[in-house]
Amino acid sequence: MTAIRLREFIDRRPAIPPSIFIVHQGKDLRGYYTGQLARVHYDYSVKRSPRPLIDLDIPFKKKSQYQPQLDQQTLIQYICFRRRSKPAEPWYKETSYQRDYSLPFYKTDWDRKLATVSSNPRPLNSLPEHYCCEGRWL
């Protein structure tokens, strides 16, 4: 009985593993969901303009969208003028705390009493006439 032999095709070139030496075109991309894969191929036939040299460019002055009005510029110049022309010494002589609490009704010494129970039985916070009419209470 004769056997039918199939032809054998022998490749005389050495076998190269395809994953190491063969360059795959494109780039693999993963999708938003799991299991989505795609391959992107770049078209290099389209000529792109060369990238400008950033270091050689002269930076231009940017114009802001907000342009101050003349009144604002005048006010800013006035504030700067007042800061330069006014000496700094009076600013440190009196603080806002000293200014607020240096009113006459806070200065009560032992010889200057605002009121006593015998001379004025009303509450102390109702004594505004004591300051304007001091001669009447003596």
UniProtKB/Swiss-Prot annotation:
InterPro entries: SPMIP3 (IPR037668)
Protein name listed in UniProt: Protein SPMIP3
Phylogenetic classification of the source organism: Eukaryota, Metazoa, Chordata, Craniata, Vertebrata
Gene: SPMIP3
